[in-house]
Amino acid sequence: MEEFKRYLELDRSQQHNFVYPLIFQEYIYALAHDHGLNKSILLENAGYDNKSSLLIVKRLITHLITQMYQQNHFIFSANDSNQNKIFGHNTNLYSQMILEGFAVVVEIPFSSRLISFLEGKEIVKSKNLRSIHSIFPFLEDKFPHLNYVLDILILHSIHLEILVQTLRYWVKDASSLHLLRFFLYEYRNWNSLITPKKSSFSFSKRNQRLFLFLYNYHVCEYESIFIFLRNQSSHLRSISSGTFFEQIDFYEKIEHFVEVFTKDFQAILWLCKDPFMHYIRYQGKSLLASKGKSLLMNKWKYYFVNFWQCYFYMWSQPGRIHINQLSNHSFDFLGYLSSVRLTPSMVRSQMLENSFLIGNAIKKFDTLVPIIPLIGSLSKAKFCNVLGHPISKPVWADLSDSDIIDRFGRIYRNLSHYYSGSSKKMNLYRIKYILRLSCARTLARKHKSTVRAFLKRLGSELLEEFFTEEERVFSLTFKKASSTSRGLYRRRIWYLDIICINDLANHK
């Protein structure tokens, strides 16, 4: 670990040039193990201890690199166990280990916080690393004043060579990039790494660390160019063409084309200029909202389609970008069904002896629980059928009664906690009913009894498990003033401890 610290303390330019030797260091794979990203692969290899396993990894890397430079490429077949062995060991197993370690190595040039983590220092919290619930107060503040929104699904597929060439401007170690290119092309047919799609690929979730790094880097590259163009549009004319091209990281600079291209691009940006433009993204979905007219949003849509096609060489389907008017359409974002609706209000005004009513409409940001997709997620998880009728959970029937009740109660509390910002929480009662009755059916199945008998015997206890913290606080504090309690319960509450969407709320 001390050696790893010394490496991280090198100059940034030196780090870029000496990434390759780290692939042969055992502590890299130990570090990948310590992060807990795939412990079973490193530990559950029967017949070998950790040291011998890491030595086999190093031997396998050497063998792969020899094959790579001899142009004697090979592809592992998941159906042929004989072809999947090198040195008498399973190559898929050790290839997974290599990919985990390789992901750690490639991340090093991008990680400026690892030294603080290794030294036990407190990591300074970035403003970008806040709860995802912090997005909604921003939407409440900004979106009622906007007119249109671009609902964008970011492309998941990208050409292999484009990805490697993009990384080349950050990681200047040619050997590491050759090895990355080798992995991407040779393992294109290996389902645990990538999903084959001719010369492009979409990332697989089984290889979490490498998947997250490649996808985040892909999105970062996409956003760095887009956000730069958005921020610089108002004062682009004061930037020289040389600085302009350096900041965008164009890979081929044609001198006689610079002047013409810059002038044309200034005109494009001037057409798309809008001081009331807001951009928000979470995972693979982003929103671009504006106070402008539909013509401006169509120009931005045209820009996105051409940007993806010309820069990433990916054909963009028209259905990946939707233009919606906020007052007439809802959009699905972060598990909520959101919209901007007009709330009528009447104001009584009196002048001298005459009084009259003034009607006024106030724009309000509305967030609803998408009950139909949520029931669909519960159906996939085998808590109910497609119509929303609760069913038992047979796989949990072997657990103790307290564990079964605790699991069902925890699922509802998590969903209720996440959807605490909903404008109308009545839909959550439907979810509570499904989970509560599914729990009762599971217990009845376990004890070979009827649901009625269990609800009669454990009714109050079972109901208590599904009380959320907010309901408990309100019921204790406002026991007599029930109307006040109901009013507080209807209010939206955004929690700042939510860093990811619940799997059931994600509808995937």
Curated annotation (Swiss-Prot):
Organism superkingdom: Eukaryota
Q: Which Pfam families match?
A: Intron_maturas2, MatK_N
Q: S-adenosyl-L-methionine: present as a keyword of the record?
A: no
One example of the protein's molecular function in GO is: RNA binding
Record has Disulfide bond as a keyword: no
A biological-process GO annotation: RNA splicing
- Cellular location of this protein? Plastid, Chloroplast
Task of the protein: Usually encoded in the trnK tRNA gene intron. Probably assists in splicing its own and other chloroplast group II introns.
UniProt record similarity statement: Belongs to the intron maturase 2 family. MatK subfamily.
Q: What is this protein called?
A: Maturase K
Provide the species name.
Manilkara zapota (Sapodilla plum)
